[in-house]
C-alpha cells in the first residue's frame, strides 16, 4: 500500500514538477518548443497547463522579437546614412555598412572602441554633452576622399530616464557642400567680372564729365574703351543667361540630321576668310559622316574653340583640324590643335570650369568672359558627347570633341 501511494505521489506531483523544472532549464537555453505533459486536472495539472501557455507566449514573443530584430538590421544595413550605436559607456556595438564606408574602416577596427575616439571628437565632446546638445554639425570624416558628413547624436533612454546608449547618424553632405561652395565662388566671380568693366567705364565717364570730352584726341579713345567694356558686359550677361537656361534645363535643343563634313568645312572656311595670318590644316575624311545635333549650338561650340586656338597661336599661326570616326561605336572624334603657348599640365582640366582663366589678364584683354569653354562643355554633353583638352607648354593645345555619328556609304540612300 505504501509503495502504491508513493508511486501515485511520484506520478501526480513529483513527475510534473520535475518536467516543469526541466522545461525551465530548456527555456533558459532558448528552447521554447517542448511542452510539459499534463497528468491530471488537479492543481498540478492546471499549473502545468499555465506553464505550457506561458512557454507558448514566450516563444511567440521571442519569434516576434527576432523578426523585428532582423527587420531592424535590414533597415540599418540598407540605410543611405551611416549609423553608429553604442552602449552607455560610449563603446560601439552596432555599425552599418554605410558608416564603415564613410569612415573608410573595417568593422573589426570599430566594434568595441569609443565612438568619440573613432570620430576624432574626444577632445571636443564628452558623452554627457551629447545628452544636452542636440545640434548637428559638419565633420570631415575621410580626408583622403574629401568626405564631409553632417552628424546628429541622440540618446537611448529607458522609461526610468536611465541612458543605455548613444546613436550617431552620419549624413553625407559632400556634394551639397561642394555645390554651395561653387555657388559662392560663382557669385563672387560674377560680381568681380561685372565690377571690373563698370569701374573702368565709370572712370572714363567721370573723366569725360570733367572736361575730357573737349580733348579731340582723348575723347574718342575714352568713348572707344567705354564701348568695348559695354560690349564685354553684354557678352558676359548673355553667357550668364545661357548658362542659367542650361542649368534649369530650359534651353531648347533643336536637333537636325547634319552632314558633318559640310558643316565643319563651312565653319573653317568662314574663319579662314577672316584670319589671313593663320594657316588652317584639314584632315577630314572624304566619306560623308552624318550626325544629329543642334547646328546653332554646335556652331557656337566650334566657333569658341577655333577662336581660342587663333587667339593663343603664336609666330607662324597654325590651326589643325582632324576628324576620325569609329564605326564600331558610331562615334567620331574632332581634334582642333593650335601651336600656341600651351597650358600647364595642372591647369588643363580646369579650363572648362566657369570663369577659370589660365592667364586672367591676357584673357580679359582679349575680350573673353571666361565662360566660353564652360558653355561649350554643357552643349557637347547635352548632345551625348564629351569634350576635353590635352596640352604641352610651349607646343600648343588640342581640344577633343566626341559625338555620336553614322557613316553613310554610297548608295545607302537608294535602298
Swiss-Prot record:
Every Histidine kinase domain range: 189-407
Residue stretches making up the PAS domain: 68-138
Keywords: ATP-binding, Cell membrane, Kinase, Membrane, Metal-binding, Nucleotide-binding, Phosphoprotein, Transferase, Two-component regulatory system, Zinc
UniProt membrane topology term: Multi-pass membrane protein
Protein location: Cell membrane
Major subcellular site: membrane
Record EC number: 2.7.13.3
Modified residue annotations for Phosphohistidine: 192
Gene Ontology CC terms, in alphabetical order: plasma membrane
Modifications made to the protein after synthesis: Autophosphorylated.
Misc remark: Overexpression of walK/walR reduces susceptibility against vancomycin.
NCBIfam families associated with the record: sensory_box
Name of the featured protein: Sensor protein kinase WalK
Species annotation: Staphylococcus aureus
Amino acid at each position: 500500500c505504501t509503495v502504491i501511494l508513493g508511486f501515485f505521489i511520484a506520478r501526480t506531483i513529483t513527475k510534473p514538477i520535475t518536467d516543469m523544472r526541466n522545461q525551465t532549464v530548456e527555456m533558459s537555453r532558448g528552447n521554447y518548443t517542448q511542452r510539459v505533459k499534463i497528468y491530471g486536472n488537479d492543481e498540478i495539472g492546471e499549473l502545468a497547463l499555465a506553464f505550457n501557455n506561458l512557454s507558448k507566449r514566450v516563444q511567440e514573443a521571442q519569434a516576434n522579437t527576432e523578426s523585428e530584430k532582423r527587420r531592424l538590421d535590414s533597415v540599418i544595413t540598407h540605410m543611405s546614412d551611416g549609423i553608429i550605436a553604442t552602449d552607455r559607456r560610449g563603446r560601439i556595438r552596432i555599425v552599418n555598412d554605410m558608416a564603415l564606408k564613410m569612415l573608410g574602416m573595417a568593422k573589426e577596427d570599430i566594434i568595441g572602441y569609443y565612438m568619440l575616439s573613432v570620430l576624432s571628437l574626444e577632445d571636443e565632446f564628452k558623452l554627457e554633452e551629447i545628452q544636452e546638445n542636440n545640434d548637428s554639425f559638419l565633420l570631415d570624416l575621410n580626408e583622403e576622399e574629401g568626405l564631409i558628413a553632417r552628424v546628429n547624436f541622440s540618446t537611448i533612454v529607458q522609461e526610468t530616464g536611465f541612458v543605455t546608449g548613444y546613436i550617431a547618424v552620419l549624413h553625407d553632405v559632400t556634394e551639397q557642400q561642394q555645390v554651395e561652395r561653387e555657388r559662392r565662388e560663382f557669385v563672387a566671380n560674377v560680381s568681380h567680372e561685372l565690377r571690373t568693366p563698370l569701374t573702368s567705364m565709370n572712370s572714363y565717364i567721370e573723366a569725360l564729365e570733367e572736361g575730357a570730352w573737349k580733348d579731340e584726341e582723348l575723347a574718342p579713345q575714352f568713348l572707344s574703351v567705354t564701348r568695348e567694356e559695354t560690349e564685354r558686359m553684354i557678352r558676359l550677361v548673355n553667357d550668364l543667361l545661357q548658362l542659367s537656361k542650361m542649368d534649369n534645363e530650359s534651353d531648347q535643343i533643336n536637333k537636325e540630321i547634319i552632314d558633318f563634313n559640310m558643316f565643319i568645312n563651312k565653319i573653317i572656311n568662314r574663319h579662314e576668310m577672316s584670319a589671313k595670318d593663320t594657316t588652317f590644316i584639314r584632315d577630314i575624311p572624304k566619306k560623308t559622316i552624318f550626325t544629329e545635333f543642334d547646328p546653332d549650338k554646335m556652331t557656337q561650340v566650334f566657333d569658341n574653340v577655333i577662336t581660342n586656338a587663333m587667339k593663343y597661336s603664336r609666330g607662324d599661326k597654325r590651326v589643325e583640324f582632324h576628324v576620325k570616326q569609329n564605326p564600331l561605336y558610331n562615334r567620331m572624334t574632332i581634334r582642333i590643335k593650335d601651336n600656341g603657348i600651351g597650358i600647364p599640365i595642372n591647369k588643363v582640366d580646369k579650363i572648362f570650369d566657369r570663369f577659370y582663366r589660365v592667364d586672367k589678364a591676357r584673357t580679359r584683354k582679349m575680350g573673353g568672359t571666361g565662360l566660353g569653354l564652360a558653355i561649350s562643355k554643357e552643349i557637347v554633353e547635352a548632345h551625348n558627347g564629351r569634350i576635353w583638352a590635352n596640352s604641352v607648354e610651349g607646343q600648343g593645345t588640342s581640344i577633343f570633341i566626341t559625338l555620336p555619328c553614322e557613316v553613310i556609304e554610297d548608295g545607302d540612300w537608294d535602298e
